[in-house]
Amino acid sequence: MDSAYWSYDNIVPSFRLDGKLVILTGGSGGLAAVVSRALLAKGADVALVDMNLERTQQAARDVLQWGEEQMKGKYESPIGQVSAWSCNIGDAEAVDLTFKAINEHHGKISSVLVNTAGYAENFPAEEYPAKNAENLMKVNGLGSFYVSQAFARPLIQNNMTGSIILIGSMSGTIVNDPQPQCMYNMSKAGVIHLARSLACEWAKYNIRVNTLSPGYILTPLTRNVISGHTEMKTEWESKIPMKRMAEPKEFVGSILYLASESASSYTTGHNLVVDGGYECW
């Protein structure tokens, strides 16, 4: 091998995302709050997408303010742009129009998609309302496909590479007892296999598709759920080998790895589980 092969830039992967546009769905949520800051710190422009425009706009302002306070003087490159968009990812036409508008607004084609949008709800299987089941599958399942499809089309048309990161769940591969979440479990199992299917189809276009499957995360929503329910938190943590729940920041490294073309150029169709060892037991 020649000296170029052994050069620093060739051997040591960069996690910089300078000049790249990242679409982050579920953009006003707890996981997106920390992910968006990390993406901005790595040089990316970030488009936050969520149902509630007002909350998403506030999230965008918060990220930019954080960037101005935390990044000033640390990097030569200017702070990237952060935009906010309202979209129901369960509506294919709305997703397509929104993603086109994002690319036009930023003057570039997005090359990274992080889909954190989705939700869970508890119903005993025999009592699960059909409408609720349909709505959950439309957002978690079809929504994951719609955003992937709208993201990939311009990349394929322009012969560009890209990375799709779909948020799965450990509930996509195991039954997370005792929560009665059969439809959520099914939706996340579908997301994991969707990523594998798209990875195989789009490998010829150099579009990588992976899932990141978290365990229990201490998002603001989760903190509210367990507030005043010490026994619930204790039960959850007893099933985790690391004996604690995860902070949202503990998923940032995994997302940056999957987003980075130099770090994960040969990783596609993979389900990266970050659960503190929960699935080992």
UniProtKB/Swiss-Prot annotation:
- Catalytic-site annotation from UniProt: S169, Y184, K188
Q: What is its EC number?
A: 1.1.1.250
What keywords tag this UniProt record? NADP, Oxidoreductase
Could you mention a single GO BP entry for this protein? arabitol metabolic process
Task: List ligand-binding residues for NADP(+).
Answer: L31, N52, Y184, K188, I217, T219
Molecular function per GO: D-arabinitol 2-dehydrogenase activity; oxidoreductase activity, acting on NAD(P)H, oxygen as acceptor
| Pathway stated in the Swiss-Prot or TrEMBL entry | Carbohydrate metabolism; D-arabinitol metabolism
Q: Which family does it belong to?
A: Belongs to the short-chain dehydrogenases/reductases (SDR) family.
Please identify the protein, giving its name as recorded: D-arabinitol 2-dehydrogenase [ribulose-forming]
Q: Which organism is it from?
A: Candida albicans (strain WO-1) (Yeast)
